[in-house]
Amino acid sequence: MDIRQVTETIAMIEEQNFDIRTITMGISLLDCIDTDIDWAAEKIYKKITTKAKDLVAVGDEIAAELGIPIVNKRVSVTPISLIGAATDSRDYVPLAKALDKAAKEIGVDFIGGFSALVQKGYQKGDEILINSIPRALAETDKVCSSVNIGSTKTGINMTAVADMGRIIKETAQLSDMGAAKLVVFANAVEDNPFMAGAFHGVGEADVVINVGVSGPGVVKRALEKVRGESFDVVAETVKKTAFKITRIGQLVGQMASECLGVKFGIVDLSLAPTPAVGDSVARVLEEMGLETVGTHGTTAALALLNDQVKKGGVMACNQVGGLSGAFIPVSEDEGMIAAVQNGSLNLEKLEAMTAICSVGLDMIAIPEATPAETIAAMIADEAAIGVINQKTTAVRIIPKGKEGDMIEFGELLGTAPVMKVNQASSAAFIARGGQIPAPIHSFKN
């Protein structure tokens, strides 16, 4: 590495808000299954506190050694609906509390996996877990929850979609932060290091390390140097910058896996913003020539950014996965917040952007009075985009306050302006239930 590359890396960290967003340890809990829920909870606590006991210390040591901030250390576990199904319990809150207790003991920021996979229907444990979500998130501090309600191979479980509209409302009513820790997915991935949607897939190794990087500020600074150049130059600039960011992520992941003695999983190529000025995906899009995010051209700019991040990242690291693309959470991106406040960005434009980027309608506050059926219809729309386009989409929305209010989540989750929602009813549509079939192009065997 020549001196120019060294100084570039230092500038990325000191001036451009580059950091490793998360080191996430995925842990299988399949060997914790027990017919007695209290025994299952005890086994879960013991396994997590044994396997992840050094995760935070190792993360801090690597950060100090490399001089690169590692913002979060997290754990993801096997979907708890699979563990709870062996018990006779009608309530999985004790398992959520075991996760929370373990997370606090080892000092991680969040623990994900209070989850269910219901894309084609409910099993016993799925229904119990989903109905346990509001209390589980209200009575814990670090637990995150997710539900997969659709996939390209199976279509969309509209009964589950309707249920999740109700569950999101109940969760928001029971606790201020609960809905911010609940994600509804289509095409959920098994190796996602980012919260709140992380869970450890059953096809994964017993314990793995997955890494998520963050570098919107680095990309913006690189684009500032090519103002007025053609899109060919813009694309090449983003690709080269993504390569550097991902290379560092791979180094951190490999070091962590060696120190902890566990398998290295993937680097998630996602560009994840924070509420800090200079760490915004929206400002990257504006640097391409948009007056403000939300205006015409926004979706095209996001498409270029997303694709070139993937191309640069894949060149830098063999093991890539997770969500891998640009995140557009409203509350966690100061540029997105500004665009909502000035009226240039609305829910409909955000939905169009989700056809391009990672995840979907993320960290968006909507009026508290929004009906559960309308929330369910938003989930259905996002799921349709994911299922038809063979990509991950999701909804993480928070029904709080009234239109125009500002909802404060604090720290990494930021602040969200309450956005306008279409007032026309979707109730009769959602009441149908059943399954929207898989698209024709899913039939590939």
Swiss-Prot record:
Name of this protein: UPF0210 protein SSA_2018
Organism annotation: Streptococcus sanguinis (strain SK36)
SUPFAM superfamilies xref list: PFL-like glycyl radical enzymes
PANTHER family attached to this UniProt entry: UPF0210 PROTEIN MJ1665, UPF0210 PROTEIN SPR0218
Domain of life where this protein originates: Bacteria
Subunit structure and binding partners: Homodimer.
Similarity-based family: Belongs to the UPF0210 family.
One Pfam family in the UniProt entry: DUF711
